Amino acid sequence: MGLHVTLQGLAGLLLLLYALPWAEGGKVLVFPMEGSHWLSMRDVVRELHARGHQAVVLAPEVTVHIKEEDFFTLQTYPVPYTRQGFRQQMMRNIKVVFETGNYVKTFLETSEILKNISTVLLRSCMNLLHNGSLLQHLNSSSFDMVLTDPVIPCGQVLAKYLGIPTVFFLRYIPCGIDSEATQCPKPSSYIPNLLTMLSDHMTFLQRVKNMLYPLALKYICHFSFTRYESLASELLQREVSLVEVLSHASVWLFRGDFVFDYPRPVMPNMVFIGGINCVIKKPLSQEFEAYVNASGEHGIVVFSLGSMVSEIPEKKAMEIAEALGRIPQTLLWRYTGTRPSNLAKNTILVKWLPQNDLLGHPKARAFITHSGSHGIYEGICNGVPMVMMPLFGDQMDNAKRMETRGAGVTLNVLEMTADDLENALKTVINNKSYKENIMRLSSLHKDRPIEPLDLAVFWVEYVMRHKGAPHLRPAAHDLTWYQYHSLDVIGFLLAIVLTVVFIVYKSCAYGCRKCFGGKGRVKKSHKSKTH
C-alpha cells in the first residue's frame, strides 16, 4: 500500500513538473486611476497575485490611496506637484461643490474644476511619457499586458507604445467616448446620456434634451481629452485620435450591470463586473463590533461621502448633525473635519470605516451616501436602503436610478435642511417598501453564474493567454463614418432608383409623343390642305 501511494505521489509530482511551464504566471503592468477607482482595481491585482501572476503598479510619486503593498511591485515616477498642493487642489474642488449659486456660475465653476483636474493629470502623464529611461525600462520588462482605467488615457497610450494588449477597468468615459471607442450602438431614444438624470423611458422633450445635451459638454470634453491626442501622436510618431487609441483595447471591464444600469446594446469585448468592490468581506474589528452591538434593536446607519470627501463646510455639518441626533439609530459617520458642536450622543465620528463590512451586518438599517457607483453597489449587494446626497459627476444619475427603483431617497445637499434629512432617514428605515425593493435588487444582482471578481480575473488571464482578443474587435472600427451608416450604399441604391425612374419617365414621354404627337400633326396638315 505504501509503495502504491508513493508511486501515485511520484506520478502526481511528475505531472505537476510537466505542467509548470504552461502554468507560469504572467506579468501585468497596472496603470490605475486615483481614488475609489484604484480601491476596486486593487482587488483584481490581489487576486492576480494569488493566482501566480506578477503585477507592477505604475503610479505618480504623489498619490492619496495608492500605497506599496506585498502583492504588487510599486513603480513610481516624478510629477511636477507636491502632496500638499494636490490636497489643496482637491479641497478647493470640494469647497466649490458645497457653494450655492445660479446655474451659469455653477457650470463655470465646475468647468474650472474639471480644467484644473485635467491639467494636473495631463502634467502627470507628460512626465511619464517624456521619461525616456523609465520607458526604456518598461519596454525591456516584457509585460504581457496593461490593466488600466481609460478615464486617464495615458495608460492606453503607453500600451500602444509598448505594443502590448490592454484590458480596461472602468465605470465609463465622459462624453460618450467609450461608446465611440467600442463602436457600440447608443440610440438616444432610450439610452440616457451621462449627467442628464433621465431614465430609459423618456418623454418627447426629454428625448430632445438627451440628444442636445452632449453638445453642451463638447467644450469640457475637448479641453480634457484633445491634449492627450497630441501627446499620443508625439509618442507614436503619427497622427492619431483618442478614439483610435482607445479602440485597440482587447477587453472593456465595465463596473456596472443591468440591475443598476438601464438595458442597452453591448459588444463582444464588453464585460460587466458591477459589484466587484463588495465581493471581499472581512469580520468587523473589535472597535466597530462594539459600536454595532451597542446600537441595540434600533441598529446602525452608515454615513460616508466617498473616499475623497471627508470634510464639509461647518454650517452644513451642523445641519446634518442636528438631523442625525433626531433618530434612534447609532450613526457611524466618516468625517475628518471640525467636530460639530451640536453632535448628538448617537453619532460617532471616525476617520475611516469598513463601509462594505458594516453594510453587510444584520443591524445596518440605512446608508447615507454620495451616490458613487462603489457605494451604490455596496448598498445593493448588502440590501440596505439609501439616502443619497449626490455631489458631482455621475452621482446625480446614480441617485436617480436608485430612486426610480424605489430603493432610496435623494436629497439636494445644498438645499436640504435638518428636517429633510430626518424625514428621509425615517422614510427609508420605517417604510418597508424601500427595504423590499433593495432586497429584490440585491437578489437579482447576486443571481449570476460567476462572481464579478472571478469574471474580471478570467478576462485578464484570457488576454494574457491569447496575447489579446482581436477576434472580439468589431469590423466597424475599420469603416469610415459614411460606410458605418451605409450612406454610400444608400446613395448608390438611390442613384439606381432615380436613374430607373428617369429612364421610365423618358421612355413613357417618348412613347406618348410617338403615339399621340404624330396623329396630331397628320390631322393638322390634312386640315390645312382642305382649306
Curated annotation (Swiss-Prot):
Places the protein is found? Endoplasmic reticulum membrane
Broad EC category: transferase
One BP term from GO: cellular response to ethanol
- Report which superkingdom the organism of origin falls in: Eukaryota
Q: Which residues are glycosylated?
A: 116, 131, 139, 293, 431
Write the signal peptide boundaries: 1-25
Stored InterPro entries: UDP-glycosyltransferase, UDP_glucos_trans, UDP_glycos_trans_CS
Q: Which PROSITE patterns match?
A: UDPGT
E.C. number = 2.4.1.17
GO CC terms of this entry: endoplasmic reticulum; endoplasmic reticulum membrane
Keyword set includes Glycoprotein: yes
The membrane topology noted for this protein in its Swiss-Prot or TrEMBL record is: Single-pass membrane protein
Q: What does this protein do?
A: UDP-glucuronosyltransferase (UGT) that catalyzes phase II biotransformation reactions in which lipophilic substrates are conjugated with glucuronic acid to increase the metabolite's water solubility, thereby facilitating excretion into either the urine or bile. Essential for the elimination and detoxification of drugs, xenobiotics and endogenous compounds. Involved in the glucuronidation of the AGTR1 angiotensin receptor antagonist zolarsatan, a drug which can inhibit the effect of angiotensin II.
Name of this chain's protein: UDP-glucuronosyltransferase 1A5
Organism of origin = Rattus norvegicus
* Gene name of the encoded protein: Ugt1a5
